Amino acid sequence: MILPEELASKSVIPAIRALVVKRLVEEHGMTQQQAAKLLGVTQPAVSKYLHQKRGAAIRLNGIKEVDQATGEIANMVSSRKVKPLEVMSRIEAACTYIKRNRYMCDLHKRLEPGIDIESCHICEQ
């Protein structure tokens, strides 16, 4: 049995980080090392995010609200003026949006074929 929180921590949060890393490097002109330092991860982790070796289990790009959130998070991080708790809060809000709007359901079904995602409404609560 895979809990939604497990799925979020192992798939959604890395996917959000991957999108933020991509923005920091491509839009804000940061090096992998700079992005890693600001996000509190290693440079090899940033490389894996950029090469879709980490954070690729669930596709979140193209979802308007997620794109907006990752843009805001990248701006917050790159400004270096925002407290880490504010960044954490924004990431958590993005995770909540993803769960409540059922963007994790297909991945959950792939990982746990016995789950009936049509009758499941756990994440909407």
Report residues per predicted region.
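Short, Lys/Arg-enriched anionic-surface-contact patches
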Residues: 1-17
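Short, amphipathic alpha-helical "recognition" segments used to contact nucleic acids or chromatin
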Residues: 13-29
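Short alpha-helical "recognition helix" segments of helix-turn-helix
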Residues: 31-37
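Short coil turns linking two alpha-helices in DNA-binding domains
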Residues: 40-42
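C-terminal flanking helix
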Residues: 53-54
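Short Lys/Arg-enriched helix C-cap and helix-to-coil transition segments
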Residues: 57-73
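Helix-turn-helix/homeodomain-like alpha-helical modules used for DNA recognition
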Residues: 72-125
